[in-house]
Amino acid sequence: MKKHLLVGLLAATLCVMVIACNNKQDMSTRTKFPWVANVTAPRNYPVEVKYGFVGFGQGQKYPIMSSFANAGIGISKGEVSFADLDGEGLAMPNRLEVLWLSYTERKFYKADIAFSEKLQARILSLFQEGYENEQKHENYSCFLVTLLPGGKIWLYLNGIARYSLVCDTLQADAIDMALGDFDKDALLVDSTVEDYCKGNLNKEQVANLKENGVPYELWSKYQERFNYDIEFEFEDNLCKIDSFHFAKHFINGEFNYACDGVKVGELSRPKQLYLKWNVADTTYTGEFFFDEQEVLDMFSKGFSHKTANVRGTFMVKVSKYNNRFDIYLQVGDYKYYLKNSQIDVFKVTPENEKDNDHLFYWNYEGEEVRKYIGA
């Protein structure tokens, strides 16, 4: 009886392995996937899109239906889907046509760009590879076009719990256009492009524009990548990291969980980290928000030395009682500390798990987290 049971288990295991291998093989040869197209722009630098199309296949076009965009770089909201997300899907994006008005610059930009073979191959490869999310294989579902000041265009593949920047080198052309040609209804509101743009900015955006202008070089900083790892070190040896709840949000808009199985190369500067860790039956959840200027300066200094080709470490050291934090970048023998990070830590124990408030530690006044200028 045991022998027959063992044979049955081996057969079942072999069957699962064959199915898994076939699924992997099918994915690696697949050239169509379900995806939708969307557009976004930095929160402080909104745009209005006259038209947008993502080309795919043999001259086919996927329309971008959103007209107003400022959800933030790398962030997709409110996309309209024409794809069957459970079906065969669409061929890979291979072209972009878009015309938009930048409210903060009072400028029109136009692009009609055929993607290089290299970019198309990268997009296909990412779809074929997918990623892991809490032990479940996921795939990207959104092709996101991010429109930046100066006519820069960044392209992302977004999915559940992962945003990947696939191209940050596309450039649109500034063009002259009459307001009525852009949108005839706009003339019912204002007679000039300048007045129309001013009227479409909210109070926050107006205040930011007055203080910071349009810092074109800032997005060049956001693009930069560095050779480093992100690590947590605990003074209490009993602390155990919950690898399924270790999330990283970067200054270039990328977002991922540490356990997603995607090979890590060079990284953008960190913007925010989220981590759960356990000590016996107590669970801590930490949210770490880094100051924009500090992070910009830290990495510029840290990787300016001769040791810049050495892999660095962005370290968060946690005290024995989980209420003190040292955060620094180490490259070779050099350490650069962050002093202005905003930190929240929540603590859940068997005794307080039914309580509404689990806030255990915070180091700043009020509830407002500082926002990045160009994000």
Put a short name on every predicted segment:
Residues 17-20:
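C-terminal motif of bacterial Sec signal peptides marking the signal peptidase cleavage site
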Residues 38-48, 232-240:
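Structural motif
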Residues 54-102, 239-290:
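Tryptophan-paired
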Residues 115-155, 296-313:
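Low-complexity, Pro/Ser/Thr- and charge-rich linker/hinge segments at domain boundaries
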Residues 108-114, 283-293:
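Edge beta-strands of extracellular beta-sandwich domains
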Residues 22-24:
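Bacterial signal peptide processing site
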